[in-house]
């Protein structure tokens, strides 16, 4: 099975460069997913969205829909269309985001806002029906993970994907949640 992991966290090295925070909770969850998926024989690719140029939706055109409603692409010349098209090549998706202020990260919101606009009403969607695993990583108390996972439920509804697992992770429960992540990577089941 081909699985795409999209993560939405990084540390800024300088004003032009981002690198994944290799000691952070989100990166640790990505590593755990990659390890388990590969152990199960899956072909895995990871894209850190923060390292890409993804601009916010412009709500352009008539009634704010631009060409995304009819053509299922975005007029902006950034990395979004390439990633969106690339998503067609995969059988399942793992979305891993940090939780900031009881919400998914800003880069996740930006990416998913545009993804919904291009794909939610696409009857020929190549994403619809595919399994997703959503992981919300909170460095604080973890109280924002549920709100973040509810936002993923809404995304799942509009994209027509199949929610395979929704996993709240905190600094204090990460070791326990490793087993949950491991089990969630068994995408061939159910």
Please name every model-derived segment.
Residues 106-107, 121-166:
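Short, glycine-/small-residue-rich phosphate/pyrophosphate-handling segment
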Residues 1-97, 101-117, 168, 174-190:
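N-terminal beta1-alpha1-beta2 submodule of the flavodoxin-like/Rossmannoid cofactor-binding fold
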């Amino acid at each position: 099975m081909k699985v795409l992991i999209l993560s939405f966290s990084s540390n800024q090295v300088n004003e032009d460069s981002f690198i994944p925070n290799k000691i952070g909770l989100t990166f640790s969850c990505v590593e755990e997913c990659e390890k388990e998926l590969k152990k199960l024989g899956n072909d895995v690719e990871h894209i850190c969205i923060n390292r890409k140029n993804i601009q916010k939706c412009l709500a352009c055109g008539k009634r704010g829909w631009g060409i995304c409603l009819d053509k299922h692409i975005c007029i902006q010349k950034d990395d979004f269309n390439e990633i969106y098209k690339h998503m067609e090549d995969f059988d399942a998706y793992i979305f891993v985001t940090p939780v900031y202020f009881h919400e998914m990260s800003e880069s996740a919101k930006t990416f998913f806002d545009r993804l919904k606009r291009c794909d939610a009403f696409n009857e020929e969607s190549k994403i619809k029906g595919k399994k997703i695993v959503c992981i919300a990583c909170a460095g604080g108390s973890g109280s924002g993970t549920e709100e973040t996972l509810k936002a993923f439920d809404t995304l799942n509804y509009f994209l027509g994907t199949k929610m395979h697992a929704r996993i709240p992770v905190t600094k204090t429960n990460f070791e326990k949640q490793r087993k949950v992540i491991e089990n969630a990577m068994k995408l061939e089941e159910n």
